[in-house]
């Protein structure tokens, strides 16, 4: 009972010191409960019969719990911070005769009590935030949102259980640490000095690993140059091949020369050379994706993934080098001019910054990398999900659609000739009301094209004018008109205007087995009509007169059905299973056609569920990583404040005003918060800019620049809010720490 009272007393007395811990854990619990609430068995949002929410419950629970394991590191770090902060207090208690095991258990009880408080508040806030998640989910299904206060017992139990288990695991470790610690170590822990920056092994080890990566880059670049380089390549492709060999080679030579002559060169100059080489090496690496898209270089997926790995290694090294050189530049700037060092309280500020330079440099590098990754996740999440949902609108255009594929059929006699009577029987059996039903074929302009099987060189298909106009009528578009000797084109919605213009300029005539057709004056159409009408690796379909189509070879059979009302989910699932059995995508026997089938209800459910899981997981992971970074930055500064508060009391005794002390604190926090955050924002902007440029066509076709900018604005607001909260909390606690110490000294 006495120990219980002591736990509550210590927790109450140290509440302000633990503000960062309480805020961080409350925020994590809030997010955990809010995102996990939609996986509850008691969660039943109001959606139509064509939707099934159970598809995403299991995946959501697995994804959120998996990402939440990162919080174990955060809980461990925060507990270690509190342990270090109270080491001198523990030493006094041990000196007075209290057993170290008892001290450890009291500390565990104190942190456990604070965790329970944070979990309780977090769950209450999570009930509110879960409404935002529900609104996101209903918006994904196209349903209106209405506020409804909900309580999910299974989610509460899972939330409490997860965080309690994490705290127990960390708490047991803390008790063991205290049991093994000597009293003298606890007393003198705050007085230990660290190695200066130039003696830190952190950056030399990174340089060694980067040198190994450079050797690998050089080997891969030389192999690709030997097997893929062609003098007929355009200049940008040649520069890419040359750069992937030359820049890694030069950077590797500098790395070897610098390692041999490091005493003459100096580590900072050596690192500057490596940094310049890393930047140059990254340019051809990141150009590969764009060049592959523009010129079809033929790189396979393992090669592209390999270069992606090289690009990530370059970015990580650049961040590490920039962080190290920034801190080295701080020392150089201090020593370069005596008047600068001794101006006002600058000497004290430089002493504060340089006292933890080695440790803070390593921490800031890790934080910068993690924060960069977090920002990229934030921006990439809406792009990927918006792209997928926009693509869904182009893919699942019809309620029921099925198309054959001739690409695995090697004899004309084996081409399918079917009207898909199983669909007709299913419709009649289930009394499904039909709005439109169209069965038609697509053709090859020339029969000889049937034997063209080069992967990226399949010929475009052709569709008869009456069938094309019937498709347009189903989708609410106006019909088109062609003369008997003309043809037109229909393009994929993601095709770029430049590519369309170039293709049209080169294909003003179309050679067919029934004669030559000329391009119509109104020759380009690009409304979404589904994915299945295009041949593999093509973005265009020829529209030809009906008389011409009757002469050509039909190679693809399609059936598109529009129902009067959306299919219920169970009915759609039965139909999908029937089509999968009757018309397999990959038949067991060779030389038989495969089929592409899409039932809109099941496809929409599947894609929306997967997209929501992806979007929620990326956003949740990004927020968790961001909270971890900001919490570590804040706790590191508060720990330094605890160790160095005597210095501030000396300044007060020397007559330094409170206003100047506040300025000193702001400058110190500005450096340690500003450097990693600024570097992360700059690197993230470069990476995100490259990513957005590479998918600009998809963004324009499926998302829209306005919608993307609104989402990015929300992301910037969340980041600014989190950063402001942590910076302000750290500044207030830092001020309190140095003020309370000054009062105790007096």
Question: For each predicted feature, which ranges?
Answer:
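Short cytosolic juxtamembrane segments of multi-pass membrane proteins
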Residues: 1-5, 181-197, 643, 736-746
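N-terminal Sec/SRP start-transfer signal
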Residues: 1-30, 197-204, 208, 265-266, ...
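Interfacial "coupling" helices/loops that link adjacent transmembrane helices in transporter permeases
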Residues: 6-17, 73-113, 190-197, 631-670
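Peri-transmembrane interface segments
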Residues: 16-23, 34-66, 82-84, 233-250, ...
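Alpha-helical transmembrane segments
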Residues: 30-62, 136, 372-398, 611, ...
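Small-residue-rich transmembrane alpha-helices
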Residues: 30-41, 77-81, 113-143, 155-180, ...
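Conserved transmembrane alpha-helices of multi-pass membrane proteins
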Residues: 52-69, 141-169, 196-209, 235-249, ...
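Nucleotide-cofactor and metal-assisted catalytic machinery
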Residues: 392-612
């Amino acid at each position: 009972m006495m120990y219980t009272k002591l736990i509550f007393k210590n927790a109450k007395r140290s509440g302000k010191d633990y503000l960062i811990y309480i805020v961080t854990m409350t925020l994590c619990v809030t997010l955990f409960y809010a995102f996990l609430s939609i996986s509850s068995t008691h969660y039943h949002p109001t959606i139509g019969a064509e939707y099934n929410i159970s598809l995403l419950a299991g995946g959501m629970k697995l994804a959120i719990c998996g990402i939440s394991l990162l919080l174990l590191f955060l809980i461990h770090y925060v507990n270690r911070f509190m342990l270090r902060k109270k080491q001198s207090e523990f030493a006094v208690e041990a000196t007075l005769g209290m057993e170290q095991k008892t001290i450890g258990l009291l500390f565990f009880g104190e942190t456990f009590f604070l965790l329970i408080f944070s979990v309780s508040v977090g769950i209450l806030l999570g009930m509110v935030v879960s409404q935002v998640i529900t609104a996101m989910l209903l918006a994904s299904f196209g349903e209106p949102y209405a506020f409804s206060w909900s309580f999910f017992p299974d989610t509460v139990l899972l939330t409490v259980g997860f965080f309690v288990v994490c705290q127990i695991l960390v708490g047991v470790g803390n008790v063991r640490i205290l049991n093994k610690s000597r009293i003298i170590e606890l007393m003198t822990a705050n007085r230990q000095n660290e190695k200066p920056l130039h003696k830190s092994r952190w950056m030399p080890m990174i340089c060694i690993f980067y040198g190994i990566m450079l050797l690998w880059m050089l080997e891969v670049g030389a192999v690709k140059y030997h097997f893929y380089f062609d003098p007929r390549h355009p200049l940008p492709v040649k520069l890419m091949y040359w750069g992937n060999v030359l820049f890694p080679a030069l950077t590797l030579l500098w790395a070897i020369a610098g390692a041999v002559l490091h005493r003459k060169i100096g580590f900072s100059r050596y690192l500057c050379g490596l940094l310049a080489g890393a930047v140059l090496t990254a340019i051809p690496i990141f150009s590969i994706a764009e060049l592959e898209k523009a010129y079809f270089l033929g790189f396979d997926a393992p090669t592209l993934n390999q270069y992606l790995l090289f690009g990530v290694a370059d970015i990580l090294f650049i961040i590490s080098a920039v962080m190290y050189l920034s801190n080295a530049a701080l020392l150089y700037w201090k020593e370069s001019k005596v008047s600068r060092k001794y101006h006002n309280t600058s000497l004290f500020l430089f002493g504060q910054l340089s006292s933890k330079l080695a440790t803070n440099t390593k921490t800031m590098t890790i934080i910068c990398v993690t924060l960069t990754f977090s920002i990229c996740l934030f921006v990439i999440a809406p792009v990927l999900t918006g792209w997928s949902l926009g693509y869904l609108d182009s893919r699942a255009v019809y309620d029921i659609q099925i198309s054959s594929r001739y690409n695995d059929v090697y004899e004309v006699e084996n081409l399918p000739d079917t009207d898909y009577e199983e669909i007709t029987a299913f419709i009649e059996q289930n009394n499904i009301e039909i709005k439109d039903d169209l069965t038609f074929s697509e053709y090859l302009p020339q029969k000889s094209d049937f034997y063209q099987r080069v992967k990226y060189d399949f010929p475009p298909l052709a569709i008869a004018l009456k069938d094309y106009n019937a498709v347009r009528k189903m989708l609410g578009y106006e019909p088109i008109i062609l003369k008997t000797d003309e043809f037109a084109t229909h393009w994929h919605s993601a095709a770029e205007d430049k590519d369309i213009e170039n293709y049209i300029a080169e294909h003003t005539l179309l050679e067919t087995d029934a004669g030559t057709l000329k391009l119509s004056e109104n020759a380009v159409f690009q409304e979404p009509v589904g994915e299945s009408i295009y041949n593999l690796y093509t973005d265009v379909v020829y529209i030809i007169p009906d008389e011409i189509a009757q002469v050509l070879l039909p190679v693809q059979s399609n059936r598109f059905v529009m129902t009067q009302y959306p299919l219920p989910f169970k009915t759609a699932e039965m139909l999908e299973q029937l089509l999968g059995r009757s018309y397999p995508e990959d038949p067991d026997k060779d030389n038989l056609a495969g089929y592409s089938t899409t039932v809109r209800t099941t496809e929409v459910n599947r894609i929306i569920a997967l997209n929501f899981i992806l979007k929620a997981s990326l956003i949740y992971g990004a927020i968790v990583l961001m909270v971890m970074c900001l919490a570590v930055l804040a706790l590191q500064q508060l720990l330094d404040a605890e160790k160095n508060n005597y210095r501030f009391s000396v300044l007060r005794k020397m007559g330094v005003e409170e206003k100047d002390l506040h300025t000193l604190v702001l400058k110190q926090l500005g450096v340690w918060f500003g450097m990693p955050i600024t570097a992360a924002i700059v690197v993230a902007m470069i990476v995100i800019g490259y990513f957005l440029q590479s998918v600009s066509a998809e963004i324009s076709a499926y998302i829209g620049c306005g919608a993307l900018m609104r989402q990015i604005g929300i992301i910037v607001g969340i980041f600014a809010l989190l950063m402001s909260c942590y910076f302000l909390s750290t500044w207030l606690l830092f001020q309190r720490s140095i003020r309370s110490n000054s009062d105790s000294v007096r």
